[in-house]
Structure formats: C-alpha cells, structure tokens
Amino acid sequence: LAMTMEHKDRPLVRVILTNTGSHPVKQRSVYITALLDSGADITIISEEDWPTDWPVMEAANPQIHGIGGGIPMRKSRDMIEVGVINRDGSLERPLLLFPAVAMVRGSILGRDCLQGLGLRLTNL
C-alpha cells in the first residue's frame, strides 16, 4: 500500500468489510471510511458502521483504554475480511481479523491491520 499525503490531512481510507461467517446475514459486505491509526493497537469498528445482524461477543478485555479513559467494547464473533480500496478503485490484498466493535466516533484501522496490509508509516 503506497499513500502520500500532507501532514495536515487525516489519513482516511475507504474500506470494504466482508463477514466470512457461515450464518445468514442481510449484508455480506459493507463499505466504510476508516482512519489509519498507528497509535492504536487494534482495529476498532464504530457501532454506527457495524451491521446490526453481524454477531458480536464479549471480549476477554472488555474495555478500550486511551487518552479519554475506558470505553466498553465487544469483539466480532466471525472473522472479518478487511480490504482497503485504493483511489483508483483497486483493492489491496485483504486480511482477516476479529475486530473490536465499540461506540467510537469513527472506525479505526489499528496496527494489527496496518501490519497485515504491509503498510509502513514514515516521514520522508
């Protein structure tokens, strides 16, 4: 994944999430916008972006801790395929995750996802 941007810009990307579970769901895939965040350990999908019929389960560590304190979270019960959509419409090699789901302002692709995509953040 190669991306160049100005420092003032937020690194937002279009993402396709595909539920790989075997149970029936209304939507197998959804498109969202997510922030690339090298400061986040894990990928967190906003409850607003998460389809209501995609199952979640209690997480072993049920809180996300950050600057603002702790936020309750759950984990996807199914493995989710995460694909970043390039500006030309092509799709990066997708990866499989069990993302966290929480009431956050926007979805975040954390280091687990960035590493899986082979993305390296540098300053030129």
Swiss-Prot record:
GO terms for biological process: proteolysis. Residues 32-113 form the Peptidase A2 domain. Pfam families: RVP. Keywords: Aspartyl protease, Hydrolase, Protease. SUPFAM superfamilies: Acid proteases (SSF50630). Gene3D superfamilies: Acid Proteases. Transmembrane segments: none annotated. The keyword Hydrolase applies. The active site is at D37. Its EC number is 3.4.23.-. One of its GO terms (molecular function) is aspartic-type endopeptidase activity. This protein is synthesized as a Gag-Pol polyprotein. Specifically liberates the five major structural proteins from the common gag precursor, as well as reverse transcriptase and integrase from the gag-pol precursor. The protease is active as a homodimer. This is Proteinase p15. The gene is gag.
